[in-house]
Amino acid sequence: MTSRYRVEYALKSHRRDEFIEWIKGLLATPFVLHADDSHADAQIVAENCQARYYEIFKDVESLVKQTIFLDELNELDPKKKSISRLRTLVPSLGKFFTELPLADAFLLEDERRAISKRRLVSPSFNDVRMILNTAQIMALTNIYKQTENNINGISGKNQQQQQQKLKLITFDGDVTLYEDGKSLDENSEVVQRLVKLLSLGLYVGVVTAAGYPRQSGAEKYYERLKGLIDHLNSNHCTLKTYQKENLLVMGAESNYLFRYNNEMKGLKFIDDEEWFLPQVKNWNIGKINYIMDTLYKHLIYLRNNFNLEDSTTIIKKERSVGIIPNSGCRILREQLEEMVLSCSRKLNTILTSSSNFADSTEALCVDDIKVCAFNGGSDVWVDIGDKALGVESLQKYICHDETVDHVCPIGKSESLHIGDQFASLGANDFKARLSACTVWIASPRETVAILDDLIDFIEG
């Protein structure tokens, strides 16, 4: 009963990823036709399945290349509006910022996960997710190594292309760097990997939903990242000052920026004027307050509807509003899903349907303001802004410093976001796909594994 419940729940449309499901469907055919040949040698069957799976990933790899090519043509001439075959097959597909060596990634993951050797369990959602993750890491590190090997003898456009490499890595907090509701401690395996990334000259950012404004908020983020910041402050830390100060924290999706400061031995709050994107600076405070007030009232309605008055608390901040369980209580998973979907629908209404409002100043034409609603696992939040803006803000802020012209500009193909929430609705990492390459993990353990691959590929 439990197993069936989980399967049916996981197949809810808003929790699917169409690209992964489509690839999984392609792999189902060779599995059904060839994986259960009881009259053949097991090794031969495995090799046959591997060859067929490899061919599928090679074909998908070619479709990705074609999609990138047509996207580039469309950017040069928007009137063309050419649609790739892959987008026809998977309409919800986003934009690829790098090619994906899916076939090679499959071989590596097949060696680890023995996908081709399975006779009764077909290639799964998680198998495909991990293959896509590995392919993205391979693509980014291939660019990195090509850059290092082609410093001389290149000019013009080719030089610009060769100078592209991974420069910025951002992370979600809960479930990505540390377990849900926990924090980084000095013994965390993630800490040494983050320190290694900083030592390689990469910028490391934490883009989290947790929002604590002003310098007083630095203490809250220190509590979350204690193990890492304590290491940076320790006598045995070998990082140079500029490498330490390549650590940034973006709070409340895209609302509060902090940067490690070596003199303060901690995080320094960065004033909005130094990093807000132009479109964000133009957002009307009245519009933001209207959105927050409307969603606050909607959460009160939902809380009353589910009889959660005694077991939950609604919190309203400057740029976010959420509902959290009281100590010793919890909100059922189905209730969390209902609330986040209801909030998303409410947002869609007030962001697009100005005719529903009697007062034109309330209608606001608020479609220029970005807002996201997400399920945090035990709570539901609605934030002004989103992680696409958070990542883009980091890309632009870093390049305000004239001393780092050698790494600027930082493009989307030179940025990587690692997170656990990539469902199309109710997940706040999903929007990061608009501003960076992404890796979809399910636990801090997977984060450690993917960072080990990343570091090995860079140094290998």
From Swiss-Prot:
Q: Which UniProt keywords apply?
A: ATP-binding, Hydrolase, Magnesium, Metal-binding, Nucleotide metabolism, Nucleotide-binding
Which residues does the annotation say bind IMP?
D172, D174, D180, T208, D379, K387
EC numbers for this chain: 3.1.3.99
Keyword Hydrolase in the entry? The reply is yes
- Family annotation (Pfam families): ISN1
GO BP, one annotated term: inosine salvage
Q: Which cofactor does it need?
A: Mg(2+)
Q: Which residues form a coiled coil?
A: none
Active-site residues per Swiss-Prot or TrEMBL entry: D172, D174
Q: Where does ATP bind?
A: R112
| Biological role stated in the UniProt entry | IMP-specific 5'-nucleotidase involved in IMP (inositol monophosphate) degradation.
Identify the PANTHER family for this entry.
Answer: IMP-SPECIFIC 5'-NUCLEOTIDASE 1
Q: How does it assemble?
A: Homotetramer.
- This protein's name: IMP-specific 5'-nucleotidase 1
User: What species was this sequence derived from?
Assistant: Candida albicans (strain SC5314 / ATCC MYA-2876)
Q: Which gene encodes it?
A: ISN1
